[in-house]
Amino acid sequence: MAKKFNYKLPSMVALTLVGSAVTAHQVQAAETTQDQTTNKNVLDSNKVKATTEQAKAEVKNPTQNISGTQVYQDPAIVQPKTANNKTGNAQVSQKVDTAQVNGDTRANQSATTNNTQPVAKSTSTTAPKTNTNVTNAGYSLVDDEDDNSENQINPELIKSAAKPAALETQYKAAAPKAATTSAPKAKTEATPKVTTFSASAQPRSVAATPKTSLPKYKPQVNSSINDYIRKNNLKAPKIEEDYTSYFPKYAYRNGVGRPEGIVVHDTANDRSTINGEISYMKNNYQNAFVHAFVDGDRIIETAPTDYLSWGVGAVGNPRFINVEIVHTHDYASFARSMNNYADYAATQLQYYGLKPDSAEYDGNGTVWTHYAVSKYLGGTDHADPHGYLRSHNYSYDQLYDLINEKYLIKMGKVAPWGTQSTTTPTTPSKPSTGKLTVAANNGVAQIKPTNSGLYTTVYDKTGKATNEVQKTFAVSKTATLGNQKFYLVQDYNSGNKFGWVKEGDVVYNTAKSPVNVNQSYSIKPGTKLYTVPWGTSKQVAGSVSGSGNQTFKASKQQQIDKSIYLYGSVNGKSGWVSKAYLVDTAKPTPTPTPKPSTPTTNNKLTVSSLNGVAQINAKNNGLFTTVYDKTGKPTKEVQKTFAVTKEASLGGNKFYLVKDYNSPTLIGWVKQGDVIYNNAKSPVNVMQTYTVKPGTKLYSVPWGTYKQEAGAVSGTGNQTFKATKQQQIDKSIYLFGTVNGKSGWVSKAYLAVPAAPKKAVAQPKTAVKAYTVTKPQTTQTVSKIAQVKPNNTGIRASVYEKTAKNGAKYADRTFYVTKERAHGNETYVLLNNTSHNIPLGWFNVKDLNVQNLGKEVKTTQKYTVNKSNNGLSMVPWGTKNQVILTGNNIAQGTFNATKQVSVGKDVYLYGTINNRTGWVNAKDLTAPTAVKPTTSAAKDYNYTYVIKNGNGYYYVTPNSDTAKYSLKAFNEQPFAVVKEQVINEQTWYYGKLSNGKLAWIKSTDLAKELIKYNQTGMTLNQVAQIQAGLQYKPQVQRVPGKWTDANFNDVKHAMDTKRLAQDPALKYQFLRLDQPQNISIDKINQFLKGKGVLENQGAAFNKAAQMYGINEVYLISHALLETGNGTSQLAKGADVVNNKVVTNSNTKYHNVFGIAAYDNDPLREGIKYAKQAGWDTVSKAIVGGAKFIGNSYVKAGQNTLYKMRWNPAHPGTHQYATDIDWANINAKIIKGYYDKIGEVGKYFDIPQYK
């Protein structure tokens, strides 16, 4: 089944911070690299003011699609609705250049869409035969006999521990004897024109697959869910495309369009939606992105499957298509999601010529789980989707069986659901080398600078070089030969054919036939006219002359993709121009105002049962007796764990009903944003015995806080904890039990199972192996120190070495530990010598005594060595084999310390004594102030840091070795600190992660700001020269109010990133505008006091920033400037009735970003747009408008003010203003807002020039 990929011309919309202009322009200004000697598409807020209906449509799309839906058809067969017996012309006009193809020019880039194109079907195909004579009158095609191998059915069987031998032939008995029939006479229709060709391009009879009765599929596993799917004949939805232009595109290891299989994932998030998952992925694609998401209702493809994604680790990414299953919560939705996934997987396998082959049990095949990749290939440590599937009483084997069945149905090997038999089997979509189909086409294309050349026939092995690049041509035919697709391009105006080009060598767009019109428009002087619609800089017919708007008389119109182009005359010059540059001079016909829909009430209440737990934040809105209360009552029940029994939604607010965990006492309703919430499963009774360390805290509730301690474990040595109850909170297990007469809850992480001989348990033959990756198969950077035991198993150069080398020479010595890796059931660490620099090898941790190693801290102190001491050592915590001076040699001497470090609970000092340097335990020294391991009291500390080390951990308690969790998912995200504590010279911060959980993190894993530097590959002189040489010169005000052309030195000074980065205010032009900072709602509301309708809208700005990935301050500054600090009528709201603005209506529509508020009538146009978008509250206008802003420059790659102004990736193109100080002015404004809010910018992206 062939994928139909098309291109579109989106309007890239940008909103200025200074001067409220809305700018729209053609895609070539935004997406293509242009001739940089003269700027063809530089935009200025003073020059262009119109936007397009395309931008409006994008705002309403719930998944931010840049396209519609995708239809899969067969890439090898195109079946005709018309079979014209015309003879093709083999000798096309060859306007080619025999020189080599110029590969130096950068290729055009174009945004893509997937507007569905009907694919006609053919009942006959022809294959090449090298010894067939071909006449000049026909295409250079050859003929061959059709080989029908489909009668021998070989269904794909599930790989499992025991495969039934008889399954291989279960479908063969039903295979009919081949019969030969004549092709039916073709009907002639207008479109689409599709012709199949023989050697003479005449219709012929072919061996057709006979009508036959197909066998029904025999399931290989029992599955009530699969039976439900079959019984209800569930249909998969159309595949939607939601591609993102800034995702990277890299080939698989075997090349573009050559994946080796598909991987099953699940999102591991019970509370997310498919839109939420996609939005989160787009904002964090640098960490991971996948090809598609599937839930019970939709299949959304988020990245082209011809290119790899980052979803399954370094080994699997270059091989497989990655698809995520979004969690559903009821039987029917889960069944639909499995049906949708199986259908999508079978479609991909069929499309890429792959057969279903489970890799689950042998590590070989085309259908993988993430667990299988972790187990057999490595590079990742995940075990999904088995846990999620088991939670629905489903398994991977059942899903694979469904994929296999879907594939066989699509291949025409078994009967579809709901039928006893079927007609001719559908043609397998694996391309057959040599089969050709040709179809009529009505489109346009531009040949990229780097291409394979022009082909006289599609059978030519190589193309001839051409200079006809970066020009728009008409496309008259499409041909598919095997897995290669070609377009026949011709001169748009004369029809002269140039030749065939490969699909990948062009930027293609659909086109409708031109229509005659008779319409007058006004057009600005300087606007370019082109010889063809969607013309390029090489096809300019002239520019509009005169001063002031001129009259353009249009006589022809054509739609290219979704853009309209008109052909006409102005001041004696004729040519094509985009309708976006024209203004209709005719009096507009009033459009009837649609009957306003009933606004959604904000008082609609929904209540549902819930089983969870929550802790009320210290800062909160209080407890509510009912969710209708306007204000809550203050409460002291903060930072305690309560049970949650219900959740309620009222308008835009969500509440939880909290109660005492151990009694039926209700506490009250709390707002969702005022708690840290976790899912909880119902408690279950257990009878288990564990050991627990003395001092371990017991709590009155699971996931209890310091305010809910029930006591601490007493005694010496491990104590016996008898558990009687167990409950899962989120992903953690808590047990209730008794130890030494005290009862309470404790996390399972603090318990150990007493050693006991294991009883062998007989397993049924059909048992499925447990799907748990016990330890991460990744290497972690650590800071530890270890002593090698005398009796050890040896040293390894790699953890993969089965046999270790003798480690006797390392025994009884201390070494630094820098790396740690789990391999199988064993854990290994990498030892380094005492200089830290040279790795020695890997030891099993069982052969070592290991302690944490702190950070070295400088000190200047004199000490007296105690009479009884352990000597001067080469390394902290050194053994007798590493002593430099014995205890007798340094006793009573003076030790001059220069640095110190903590080893576990001890402190060692490095210094000099008797002209020798080394380490001494602090316990062996006496000083005026004794050096001891210190733990300072935790103190309040409010600051938002950025997590910079994805390989680090966050902790439940500081310095804990057990209760720690990876920071990988939170890397480069904000961390709001509320407390600080120093333990053994290590500073720890306690605060809130981006998911709302509270944790401790080391200061070394945090940064005050995250600055990334990107190399441009050009010098500052080069880019300044390009900017200074533009047709529309950069502007500067040397005298206030008077604009003049900036010279080279002015431009170079304005673009100097090194200078700008040193200025505390100008540095903000490098602030990433596509990265929210999680600024607290309280701070935002304080800043918005007195700002008109924007007052108290902090929650809306916070939601908008998180939902669409936009910096909060950038959004706020936009809104303040557009609305005059929240006081404009557009912001305060109005209605449009009978095409007139009504400001006193009951329902008002708000527009706080000035979207679509065109200069000719900004209030009416802006309110009309808000009404269409449904923005009947200020908060809706904020959130909805943020999506519009996010889809403009911010998401188009120009995500800083500097990039908007100077576009360092493609200097001189797609730039936002001509004023060289534009970025400086706006940087100072944003810095000023940050200062008023009391925050600083966290994420900066600075270009660097050579």
UniProtKB/Swiss-Prot annotation:
Q: Which GO terms describe its cellular component?
A: extracellular region
Q: What is its main location?
A: secreted
- Which Pfam families does the UniProt record give? Amidase_2, Glucosaminidase, GW
Residue spans of biased composition, Low complexity class: 173-196
Question: What ranges does the record list as Polar residues composition bias?
Answer: 103-138
Could you cite one Gene Ontology molecular function of this protein? N-acetylmuramoyl-L-alanine amidase activity
Keyword Hydrolase present in the record's keywords: the answer is: yes
User: Which SUPFAM superfamilies does this entry report, sorted A to Z?
Assistant: N-acetylmuramoyl-L-alanine amidase-like, Prokaryotic SH3-related domain
E.C. number, please? Answer: 3.5.1.28, 3.2.1.96
Localization annotation: Secreted
Q: How is it modified after translation?
A: Undergoes proteolytic processing to generate the two extracellular lytic enzymes, probably at the septal region on the cell surface.
Q: Which GO biological-process labels does this protein carry?
A: cell wall organization; peptidoglycan catabolic process
Question: What CDD domains does the record tag this protein with?
Answer: PGRP
Ranges for region Disordered: 103-151, 173-219
Alphabetical keyword list: Cell wall biogenesis/degradation, Hydrolase, Multifunctional enzyme, Repeat, Secreted, Signal
Q: Show the InterPro entries listed in the entry.
A: Amidase/PGRP_sf, Amidase_domain, GW_dom, GW_dom_sf, MGlyc_endo_b_GlcNAc-like_dom
Which Cys-Cys disulphide bridges does the record give?
A: none
What is the top-level taxon of the source organism? Bacteria
Give residue ranges for domain GW. Answer: 437-511, 513-587, 606-680, 682-756, 778-853, 855-930, 937-1011
What is written about domains in the entry's comments? The GW domains are responsible for directing the proteins to the septal region.
Q: What does this protein do?
A: Endohydrolysis of the di-N-acetylchitobiosyl unit in high-mannose glycopeptides and glycoproteins containing the -[(Man)5(GlcNAc)2]-Asn structure. One N-acetyl-D-glucosamine residue remains attached to the protein; the rest of the oligosaccharide is released intact. Cleaves the peptidoglycan connecting the daughter cells at the end of the cell division cycle, resulting in the separation of the two newly divided cells. Acts as an autolysin in penicillin-induced lysis.
Could you identify this protein by its name? Bifunctional autolysin
Q: Which organism is it from?
A: Staphylococcus aureus (strain MSSA476)
Gene for this chain:
atl
